[in-house]
């Protein structure tokens, strides 16, 4: 295959190496193993991880550029470098250490140009990812290098999603913009007249509102009322088009999903406008699963992303529980202890955790099994 000759696995390269001196590649290998990147590569059991996730070579069709182990290595490399998909491919083409990290050798005359391959690999791994089974593989591999296996440290944190800070006005405007665009598209496809509404007037008012440095609460409330009413009207107009011409239109699954999210946004915004509290508040149209996580920090009172309850074993963190909805980590200390004992096969004798974990149930549990804790004693000292 002509295309596959552009990228080769390193194991296949010895007889046909494109260097004038064979010693050069050996020097590159030696420098790679001595580098920080090489040391990082040596601590991951990539083959076992690929097998656990069910990744395998395709027997039919074109051979993949990246082997199953190399796909996981590429994701580790992306997390390590912090590059975007495009930047990662550009550096992979020109950095031989990055290529060795992924067990490939790229012909300089035929570099990888499709940067979307990184996204495709990420989606494939995400569809097969089972955090618990993968952590068991990593724990068994790292156990010989860890000390203090009897000490369990627990804490909760938030893995923030990269998104702009959400506000009611931004959320309403995104909903209006998307819905109006599709109403116009439906009218063009059907050859019918576009229904009348106040979209352009609201768009001008919103633009003027965004340009102001200081926004009065009365002006914000007035514009929010107009946007809620317009969104309600656009949904009615869209439903009327669907009722009359629904058989002539084709809706994708993403379209239906986005529409249902916008309906929920309208319901929530109407309730908040009259002063009611809303549960499971949507903060992003694209990432409808993200919820506000109240952290109570001085710099950030609210964060947006997945809340995670972690255990730390000799500096290595493992995920005990992950959820995009807020939860009370204080009731999960027993699960943390059981998880560490399962991963390390060593009885936990010491626990260090925040005061939120120091409830009566956890204190009784630790006392019953002889586990010493970092909790402050209850009551007044004698």
Where are these regions (language model features)?
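Charged, often Cys/His-bearing segments associated with DNA-binding zinc-finger transcription factors
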Residues: 1-47
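Basic, short loop/linker segments at the boundary and entry of helix-turn-helix/winged-helix-like folds
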Residues: 34-73, 80
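Trp/Phe/Arg-rich N-terminal binding region typifying the photolyase-homology
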Residues: 56-70, 81-131
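Mobile genetic element proteins and their domesticated derivatives, centered on retroelements
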Residues: 74, 88, 155, 310, ...
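Active-site- or DNA-interface-adjacent structural scaffold in DNA-acting proteins
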Residues: 105-287
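Active-site cores of enzymes that catalyze phosphoryl transfer or operate on phosphate-rich substrates
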Residues: 276-312
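Electropositive, glycine- and tryptophan-enriched low-complexity nucleic-acid-binding patches
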Residues: 297-343
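Helix-centered, glycine/charged polyanion-binding patches within enzymatic domains
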Residues: 355-382
């Amino acid at each position: 295959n002509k295309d596959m000759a552009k990228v080769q696995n390193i194991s296949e390269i010895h007889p046909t190496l494109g260097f004038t001196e064979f010693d050069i590649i050996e020097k590159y290998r030696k420098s790679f193993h001595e580098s920080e990147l090489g040391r990082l590569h040596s601590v991951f059991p990539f083959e076992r991880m690929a097998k656990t996730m069910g990744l395998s070579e395709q027997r039919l069709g074109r051979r993949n550029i990246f082997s199953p182990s190399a796909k996981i290595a590429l994701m580790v490399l992306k997390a390590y470098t912090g590059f975007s998909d495009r930047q990662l491919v550009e550096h992979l083409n020109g950095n031989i250490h990055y290529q060795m990290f992924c067990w490939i050798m790229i012909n300089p005359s035929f570099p990888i140009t499709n940067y979307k391959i990184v996204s495709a690999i990420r989606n494939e791994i995400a569809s097969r990812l089972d955090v618990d089974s993968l952590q068991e593989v990593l724990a068994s591999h790292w156990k010989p290098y860890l000390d203090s296996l009897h000490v369990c440290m627990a804490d909760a944190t938030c893995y923030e999603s990269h998104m702009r800070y959400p506000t009611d006005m931004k959320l309403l405007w995104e909903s209006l913009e998307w819905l109006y665009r599709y109403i116009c598209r439906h009218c063009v496809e059907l050859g019918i007249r576009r229904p009348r509404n106040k979209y352009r007037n609201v768009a001008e008012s919103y633009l003027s509102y965004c340009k102001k440095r200081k926004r009065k609460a009365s002006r914000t409330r007035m514009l929010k009322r107009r946007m809620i009413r317009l969104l309600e009207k656009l949904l009615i107009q869209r439903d009327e088009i669907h009722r009359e011409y629904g058989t002539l239109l084709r809706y994708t699954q993403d379209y239906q999903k986005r529409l249902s999210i916008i309906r929920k946004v309208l319901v929530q915004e109407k309730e908040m406008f009259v002063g009611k509290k809303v549960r499971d508040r949507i903060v992003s149209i694209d990432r409808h699963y993200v919820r506000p996580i109240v952290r109570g920090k001085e710099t950030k009172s609210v964060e947006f992303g997945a809340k995670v309850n972690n255990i730390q074993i000799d500096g290595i963190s493992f995920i005990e529980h992950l959820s995009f909805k807020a939860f009370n980590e204080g009731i999960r200390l027993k699960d943390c202890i059981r998880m560490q004992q399962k991963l390390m096969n060593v009885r936990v004798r010491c626990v260090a955790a925040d005061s939120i974990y120091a409830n009566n149930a956890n204190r009784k549990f630790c006392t019953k099994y002889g586990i010493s804790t970092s909790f402050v004693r209850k009551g007044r000292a004698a």
